[in-house]
Regions:
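Surface-exposed coil/turn segments at beta-strand junctions on protein surfaces, enriched
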Residues: 10, 33, 44, 66-68, ...
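Extended, low-complexity, turn-rich repeat/linker tracts enriched in Gly/Pro/Ser/Thr and Asp/Glu
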Residues: 41-51, 91-94
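Short strand-edge motifs at loop-to-beta-strand transitions and within beta-strands
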Residues: 26-28, 69-75, 83
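Edge beta-strands of jelly-roll/beta-sandwich modules across compartments, strongly enriched
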Residues: 86-103
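Transition segment at domain starts
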Residues: 1-30
Length: 103
């Protein structure tokens, strides 16, 4: 059984995934500065998503699980560093976008 069927783009300023099947865990390191924002958009057509964002020190700055509906949110960055975005899909179809936004 495939765990992921779709496309993925990831670098130090964004993670974008568009899929018909996402049934695994993926993560991406974003390099952020204080005052910037991580803008997230989730599209859930079926299945569920879990999202966690944490600093390089392991501090969790955002966490949500069992997400069944589409939505968006922003996470304000309070200190410079690497922020790891971890997304887990359970038989999910849809897309996720996490992008660095300045200001």
């Amino acid at each position: 059984e495939p765990e992921f069927d779709g496309s993925r783009t990831g670098n130090d300023s964004r993670l974008i995934m568009d899929y018909t099947l996402f049934n695994t865990t993926d993560s991406q390191d974003l390099v952020m500065k204080a005052g910037e924002t991580i803008h997230a958009e989730l599209v859930v057509k079926s299945g569920t998503l879990s999202v966690q964002i944490q600093t390089e020190n392991g501090e969790v700055v955002y966490e949500d699980s069992d997400i069944k509906t589409s939505g968006s949110f922003n996470v304000a960055v309070k200190e410079n560093g690497i922020y790891t975005v971890t997304v887990t899909g359970k038989m999910a179809e849809g897309s996720v976008s996490f992008q660095k936004a300045v200001g």
